[in-house]
C-alpha cells in the first residue's frame, strides 16, 4: 500500500526534510515563519513517535534556523543530531569569488557565512584565500576595491531571492546535493566541513539554531564560534539578535513555550 505523511519515515535513521511551503517571488524566508514552524512542530513530534532510532535529521525548509530549532525541540533529540542547511550561501560566495578572479572554484578556500540563513547572515571573508593568497590582502586594491567586496557580500545574502526572481521558484539542485552530503557524513562518510546550522547555547549565544564553524560526522555536529574581524563579529551578533526576535515571536504564536520551559519538552536542551 502507499505510505502517506508520517508513515513514510517510520523507523528511519536518517532524515532530510524539505516539507514546508516554498518561498515565492517577493517573499523573504522570514515570511514563512508561522506556517512552516507549525509544520516543523508536527515533524518533530512525529520523529519522536515514529523514529525512535533516528541518528540524524537535516532540515531544509525555511526559515531553516527556526524550523530546525522547532524540530529539535519537539523531537527530543540531542542538539548534535539535528542540523539545518546553511552551506548554500558559503558556496555562492565561493562561486562569486572564483568568477571574479578567473580561477577554479576549488582554488577559493575558507568561504563561510555564519549566523542566520537569511538576508541577515554574516558573510565572513577574513579566512578566505584566492589561489593561496589571503583575500584580505586583495580587498582594497585596484583589483578588488572595498566597494566591490561589499556589493558581493550583499549579493550573496540576497542570492536566494535572486534565484526566485529569475526562476519563479526556489533552487533545488544545490540544496539537494548539499543536504545529501550532510547525511552522507552523518552516516560515516567524509566529514562535512561547510557551515551548518546547529543548536548553540553558550555564554554569548543562547538557545538558538544558527550557522557556526561546524564539523558534521558520524558522531554528530560539533561547532566552534568563528573568529573574524570586528566588523564580521558585529555582523554575526546582529544576525543572532535577528534570530532571537523570530524565536521569541514563536513564543507569542504559541508554537513553542518560553525558553525557560524547553527542557520540560526536550531534556537534552
What are these regions (language model features)?
Residues 24-25:
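Helix N-cap/beta-alpha junction loops of NAD(P)-dependent oxidoreductase domains
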Residues 1-5, 10:
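Single conserved hydrophobic/aromatic residue that forms the stacking wall/gate
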Residues 75-81, 90-269:
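C-terminal substrate-binding/catalytic lobe of Rossmann-fold NAD(P)-dependent dehydrogenases
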Residues 10, 45-49, 184:
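Surface-exposed alpha-helical segments enriched in charged/polar residues
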Residues 19-21:
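Conserved NAD(P)H cofactor-binding loop of Rossmann-fold oxidoreductase domains
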Residues 13-16:
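N-terminal Rossmann-like NAD(P) cofactor-binding module of classical short-chain dehydrogenase/reductase
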Residues 28-96:
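Rossmann-like NAD(P)(H) cofactor-binding subdomain of soluble oxidoreductases
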